[in-house]
């Protein structure tokens, strides 16, 4: 659920991150070169529990390290267990007994190639060999098992906008960007001839019938397949108009967003451009959806719930933008989760930050447990712990997926932003928690996101944060900190009719416990929470199950 822009601003000013304690007043990482995160982790792993965890992990570690999934390298150095995330475009490879990040090895799910005489398919984000008795044949950049016959190649791109340099509106001119990871189908009349996928640069090659016919066409779909052959995530037009209360029943003609061109036009000029007037905003949403799907798979080694994102131009929703793990059968298949995105004049579909925020809720629902504590919430206004945890995680996931600390959106004709690194909003003041009000105090969701952002930046890998979300302690009710879900409503910008239920719910403190119980460095935790002046999390005494 998006937060609302509100004139009710609360805050204590901006407080900045400081290093954890060392000897006396000296930070624990004082001797480390700037940017040397591995040195910081060695120097600041200052508790018996952390050392014991490292010793256990290192006793099982191959001498040259190992890959954890596609994007994380694990190794031990001087008895300290370390992890590092590979940069975008790189994957973890194990060669000659050594695990490392290799540049240029990432690929788009479903793309094929010929390599070393063999046929390879991109599976789970990396190239995997496949049996091919007929021999691999390369045609226009795509690998085929055997001769493919007649093919057509091209490139797909779409028009998109983003925030302008001042973050006051969308860019006045759209730019054309590659449409990577989109499904591409070749048809003769209604008969499917071939189905492929665009690579990271938007390039595709598909089989076509011999001889060009007027009924031949190429269709690009805003849809993706997981590791199988079934479409598992897509952007769809709900075939509705006006405002609707969620969860809304899609119209009978609801369909996955697609764009069609004649084969003949692409033979003459093999560039498939999706323009704004054709709904390129849906293509932009799919780009964000694909990023979230890939991030989820890389971090957890498994796919999330099959999800559809509803975007209809001129269609709005009672929640603004929101997510729910509510199943629906529509647009040709059953989906286990839905995202509703507004199609009004704010053109918020251009906000990759907002779309990925909603998909952060999808990640939590797919791999963790949601607090199910919903309701209106406003920038700068502390809310209840369950909602703050859910919304804060979603905003952090958006930041992590984009590699940016700045969240941005447009509502009611107003563009606004929040910077997690600086703890600074574009409007009003930042609200900080108070150490005297305990772990279950109301807390502003962006403060939760800022804490998570610092936790992620304090180590060379964000993998511990994703693992903590899926930890058994975060998925077993009741939760250790004892928080109970609340219900309330808003009246004139104020919380009224607050009611505590008997339903347990997870909150930020439970998540921090899960992190610490897995051996997370105390110094990094304290630097993020600042317990003496802000959130009073006791890193020395986590509740472990």
Regions found by a protein language model. Give the residues of each.
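Active-site recognition of the HExxH zinc-binding catalytic motif
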Residues: 353-370, 391-395, 399
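Short pre-active-site segment immediately N-terminal to the catalytic Zn-binding motif
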Residues: 339-355
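Catalytic zinc-binding patch centered on the HExxH motif and its immediate surroundings
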Residues: 311-338, 349-350
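Short, acidic Ser/Thr/Gly-rich low-complexity loop/linker segments typical of extracellular
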Residues: 187-207
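Cysteine-rich, disulfide-bonded extracellular modules and peptides in secreted proteins
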Residues: 24-148
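Short, ordered, surface-exposed loop/turn motifs in non-cytosolic proteins
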Residues: 159-189
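Zn2+-dependent metallopeptidase catalytic core
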Residues: 207-209, 273-308
